[in-house]
């Protein structure tokens, strides 16, 4: 089966490889999210800072390694760099399973952030390389949806696995093994992809670029603080890790939905799309503060996020 790209076609297996890389963007810090509220019980001598560091360190280290990865692509083959990142990612999953102390978990979280940082820019780069025009826009929307489908599925899974043993949620970090094998098809197909000549007129609008970066940073921050702090809120409401996992997954399920109809959403709201997104998120957060019921929290998290 061949997939239309706007500049030819690619095999379905190549597209699956690209999608599998997009799915990995959701994983860093995910496994510990449902059990953050229990970490003080598992490790009674750990401070609140240690627990927060465990969940935020992967994202923190992802940032500099995204920049480094972008620079390395100028000298190193993209697919080779991707495979190195996947190996580091999967290795961190194995080390998580073997860790029994908080400092070990924190150290492995740093390693996870390094692997994730090497992968993230390449996941979007692969879409940009293979697709153009409306096909590219559609794939970016699907990529976002796939990322959040992974979040939904993995969060529910980790929530229930945490009730069996706190080590088991880290199984989700072995998913890069699948992407590693699919990356060989990417390597084979990349050779045949012809570069696209793009004519750019005028200069880059720096102010617009900065405003988009700030907006994306704000929306990402608002989404992250919900997923990171919800387990502690659930603990205060005396809910178990399974319920925490379900509600976090509903949050990402709602984020996922617009990705399937991104072009349609943009055509309806136009320049007001970002305003609508922020209003939905603000309304959801206000309702979270006012609610202590599990069912109501679930409904709030379905209606809250509209990250486009």
Give the positions of each predicted feature.
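Paired small-residue
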Residues: 92, 103-111, 296-300
